[in-house]
Amino acid sequence: MMTDDIYDTDPTDAPDPKTVCPFKICVDSREQTPFHFLSIDPFTIVPLHHVALSTGDYSISELEDRITVERKSISDLCGSITVGRDRFEREFERMAEMQRHPLGGFACVVVEGELSEVCRHVAEKTRLSTDSLLGTIDSWSIRYGVHWRFCPGRRFAEIQTLKILHQFWRQDQKRLKELKELTSQGKAADE
């Protein structure tokens, strides 16, 4: 019997609910080498939804206007800061707008390489100076308030991306719970 569920209809086949990610990750449909988020502690199953995101490569379903993670390989980053600089800066402008959301927002660039590797790549393979690269990263961090995570490799970047999304989701759930409690207290006081 074929189903659209993540598991067969036999409830004994269902995964432990604690191991299923409680939110759906939106993956930009234009992402060329997307993360799959397979077996990243504490989750064994992470629901994914491929969709054209207006900003970034990863977000949370129904929170796409508030959270984004832009994934970059080392060569992607160098190309984005040199040849694709104007386009990349427009992306930062959109990420900055997202962070100003009234309910709170977060934007981050996750790089599949440590900063020292990025600097070495720039020195060896581009005409961009290391000082220019670092100046751009620092300047854009300050100007747009976008966070950067330099990770030792792709798998670590994938784990970091899931952890960022999960932490944002948890804090958002906590905020929603507090708002509901305040609302119910206000209704009780009115009665």
Task: Locate predicted features.
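Conserved catalytic cores of phosphodiester-cleaving nucleases, focusing on short active-site segments
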Residues: 67-73
